[in-house]
Amino acid sequence: MNFSIKATIRAWSAPEHKLACRKQLWRKIVAELERRGKRRHEAGTFLLGIERNGRKEVQSAVYYDDLDPSAYDSGVCILHGDAFAKLWSHCREKGLTVVADVHTHPGAGFQSDSDRTNPMVARQGHIAIILPNFARWPIRQGNLGIYEYCGQHEWLERSPAHAPNFFYTGFWS
Protein backbone atom coordinates (compact mmCIF):
# COMPACT_ATOMS: atom_id res chain seq x y z
CA MET A 1 0.00 0.00 0.00
CA ASN A 2 1.35 3.39 -0.99
CA PHE A 3 0.06 6.50 0.80
CA SER A 4 1.35 9.72 2.26
CA ILE A 5 0.61 10.67 5.85
CA LYS A 6 1.07 14.34 4.95
CA ALA A 7 -1.40 14.10 2.04
CA THR A 8 -3.91 12.29 4.23
CA ILE A 9 -3.71 14.90 7.00
CA ARG A 10 -3.85 17.74 4.46
CA ALA A 11 -6.99 16.25 2.89
CA TRP A 12 -8.58 16.12 6.33
CA SER A 13 -7.41 19.54 7.61
CA ALA A 14 -7.97 21.58 4.41
CA PRO A 15 -10.20 19.48 2.16
CA GLU A 16 -11.51 22.23 -0.12
CA HIS A 17 -8.37 24.21 -0.89
CA LYS A 18 -7.39 24.73 -4.52
CA LEU A 19 -4.12 26.59 -3.91
CA ALA A 20 -1.54 25.73 -1.25
CA CYS A 21 1.73 27.33 -0.19
CA ARG A 22 3.95 26.25 2.70
CA LYS A 23 3.68 28.74 5.54
CA GLN A 24 7.41 29.57 5.58
CA LEU A 25 7.51 30.08 1.81
CA TRP A 26 4.39 32.30 1.90
CA ARG A 27 5.92 34.47 4.64
CA LYS A 28 9.16 34.77 2.63
CA ILE A 29 7.25 35.79 -0.53
CA VAL A 30 5.22 38.42 1.34
CA ALA A 31 8.35 39.84 3.01
CA GLU A 32 10.12 40.03 -0.35
CA LEU A 33 7.18 41.86 -1.94
CA GLU A 34 7.19 44.35 0.92
CA ARG A 35 10.95 44.87 0.47
CA ARG A 36 10.76 45.30 -3.31
CA GLY A 37 7.83 47.73 -3.09
CA LYS A 38 9.59 49.75 -0.38
CA ARG A 39 6.14 50.49 1.10
CA ARG A 40 5.76 53.10 -1.68
CA HIS A 41 4.70 51.28 -4.84
CA GLU A 42 3.22 48.02 -6.05
CA ALA A 43 5.35 44.90 -6.36
CA GLY A 44 4.47 41.50 -7.74
CA THR A 45 5.51 37.92 -8.34
CA PHE A 46 4.46 34.81 -10.20
CA LEU A 47 3.96 31.77 -8.00
CA LEU A 48 5.39 28.68 -9.68
CA GLY A 49 4.48 25.14 -8.83
CA ILE A 50 2.64 22.04 -9.91
CA GLU A 51 -0.95 21.02 -10.33
CA ARG A 52 -1.93 17.74 -8.70
CA ASN A 53 -5.44 16.29 -8.35
CA GLY A 54 -7.07 19.64 -9.12
CA ARG A 55 -4.94 21.51 -6.58
CA LYS A 56 -2.13 23.95 -7.25
CA GLU A 57 0.95 23.72 -5.02
CA VAL A 58 3.36 26.67 -4.85
CA GLN A 59 7.04 25.71 -4.88
CA SER A 60 8.82 28.94 -5.79
CA ALA A 61 8.36 32.52 -6.96
CA VAL A 62 9.70 34.72 -9.76
CA TYR A 63 9.40 38.46 -9.05
CA TYR A 64 8.23 40.83 -11.75
CA ASP A 65 11.29 43.08 -11.54
CA ASP A 66 13.60 40.08 -12.03
CA LEU A 67 11.83 39.48 -15.35
CA ASP A 68 11.50 43.17 -16.29
CA PRO A 69 13.72 45.66 -14.39
CA SER A 70 11.30 48.49 -15.26
CA ALA A 71 8.22 46.63 -13.97
CA TYR A 72 7.63 49.10 -11.12
CA ASP A 73 8.79 52.34 -12.77
CA SER A 74 5.25 53.72 -13.07
CA GLY A 75 4.34 52.82 -9.47
CA VAL A 76 2.06 49.98 -10.59
CA CYS A 77 3.04 46.56 -11.92
CA ILE A 78 3.52 46.57 -15.69
CA LEU A 79 5.33 43.77 -17.54
CA HIS A 80 6.45 44.04 -21.14
CA GLY A 81 6.27 41.13 -23.60
CA ASP A 82 9.86 39.92 -23.27
CA ALA A 83 9.30 39.37 -19.54
CA PHE A 84 6.82 36.63 -20.37
CA ALA A 85 9.33 34.91 -22.69
CA LYS A 86 11.76 34.84 -19.74
CA LEU A 87 9.01 33.53 -17.44
CA TRP A 88 8.00 30.66 -19.75
CA SER A 89 11.67 29.76 -20.30
CA HIS A 90 12.22 29.66 -16.52
CA CYS A 91 9.14 27.45 -16.09
CA ARG A 92 10.40 25.01 -18.75
CA GLU A 93 13.86 24.84 -17.13
CA LYS A 94 12.39 24.09 -13.68
CA GLY A 95 9.56 21.84 -14.88
CA LEU A 96 7.02 24.11 -13.17
CA THR A 97 4.01 26.13 -14.24
CA VAL A 98 2.55 29.47 -13.15
CA VAL A 99 -0.07 28.58 -10.54
CA ALA A 100 -0.91 32.16 -9.49
CA ASP A 101 0.31 35.72 -9.40
CA VAL A 102 0.50 38.02 -6.39
CA HIS A 103 0.83 41.78 -6.28
CA THR A 104 0.46 44.50 -3.69
CA HIS A 105 -1.92 47.44 -3.39
CA PRO A 106 -1.55 50.54 -1.20
CA GLY A 107 -4.83 50.03 0.68
CA ALA A 108 -7.27 47.14 0.71
CA GLY A 109 -6.64 43.88 -1.13
CA PHE A 110 -9.26 44.24 -3.85
CA GLN A 111 -9.20 43.83 -7.61
CA SER A 112 -9.00 47.15 -9.46
CA ASP A 113 -10.54 47.75 -12.88
CA SER A 114 -7.04 47.55 -14.34
CA ASP A 115 -6.43 44.19 -12.62
CA ARG A 116 -9.77 42.89 -13.87
CA THR A 117 -9.22 43.90 -17.49
CA ASN A 118 -5.49 43.05 -17.68
CA PRO A 119 -4.90 39.60 -16.16
CA MET A 120 -1.22 38.72 -15.83
CA VAL A 121 -2.01 35.28 -17.24
CA ALA A 122 -5.18 35.27 -19.33
CA ARG A 123 -5.83 31.56 -18.91
CA GLN A 124 -8.97 30.07 -17.43
CA GLY A 125 -8.32 28.92 -13.86
CA HIS A 126 -5.45 31.35 -13.28
CA ILE A 127 -5.43 32.75 -9.73
CA ALA A 128 -4.59 36.36 -8.83
CA ILE A 129 -3.89 37.35 -5.21
CA ILE A 130 -3.80 40.96 -4.06
CA LEU A 131 -2.02 41.86 -0.82
CA PRO A 132 -3.15 44.97 1.09
CA ASN A 133 -0.99 47.79 2.46
CA PHE A 134 1.99 47.09 0.18
CA ALA A 135 2.40 43.69 1.90
CA ARG A 136 3.11 45.19 5.32
CA TRP A 137 3.12 42.28 7.79
CA PRO A 138 1.06 41.02 9.55
CA ILE A 139 -1.58 40.34 6.92
CA ARG A 140 -4.70 38.53 8.02
CA GLN A 141 -5.84 35.84 5.59
CA GLY A 142 -9.25 37.53 5.54
CA ASN A 143 -7.70 40.70 4.06
CA LEU A 144 -6.38 39.01 0.93
CA GLY A 145 -8.08 39.59 -2.40
CA ILE A 146 -8.17 36.27 -4.28
CA TYR A 147 -9.67 35.92 -7.75
CA GLU A 148 -9.91 33.07 -10.26
CA TYR A 149 -9.94 33.93 -13.96
CA CYS A 150 -12.83 32.53 -16.04
CA GLY A 151 -11.87 34.04 -19.41
CA GLN A 152 -13.35 37.02 -21.27
CA HIS A 153 -12.26 39.35 -18.43
CA GLU A 154 -14.61 37.57 -16.00
CA TRP A 155 -13.43 36.54 -12.55
CA LEU A 156 -14.76 34.58 -9.59
CA GLU A 157 -13.98 36.02 -6.19
CA ARG A 158 -12.20 33.41 -4.06
CA SER A 159 -11.31 35.71 -1.16
CA PRO A 160 -11.69 34.17 2.30
CA ALA A 161 -15.10 35.79 2.89
CA HIS A 162 -16.43 34.04 -0.24
CA ALA A 163 -14.35 30.84 -0.29
CA PRO A 164 -12.72 30.40 3.13
CA ASN A 165 -10.75 27.26 2.26
CA PHE A 166 -9.61 28.15 -1.26
CA PHE A 167 -6.05 29.22 -0.32
CA TYR A 168 -4.19 27.22 2.32
CA THR A 169 -0.90 28.34 3.88
CA GLY A 170 -0.77 25.96 6.80
CA PHE A 171 1.76 23.42 7.94
CA TRP A 172 0.31 20.62 5.83
CA SER A 173 0.75 22.38 2.45
Curated annotation (Swiss-Prot):
Zn(2+) binds at H103, H105, D115. Its cofactor is Zn(2+). Keywords: Antiviral defense, Hydrolase, Metal-binding, Metalloprotease, Protease, Ubl conjugation pathway, Zinc. GO terms for molecular function: metal ion binding; metallopeptidase activity; ubiquitin-like protein peptidase activity. GO terms for biological process: defense response to virus; protein modification by small protein conjugation; proteolysis. Component of the Bil (bacterial ISG15-like) antiviral defense system, composed of BilA, BilB, BilC and BilD. The Bil system specifically conjugates a ubiquitin-like moiety (bilA) to the bacteriophage central tail fiber (CTF, or tip attachment protein J) via reactions involving E1 (bilD) and E2 (bilB). Modifies CTF of phage SECphi27 and SECphi4, which probably interferes with assembly of the phage tail. Also modifies T5 baseplate hub protein pb3 (gene D16), but not gp27 of phage T6 (Bil defends against T6). BilC is a probable metalloprotease that may cleave non-specifically conjugated targets. Belongs to the M67B family. This is Bacterial deubiquitinase-like protein BilC. The gene is bilC.
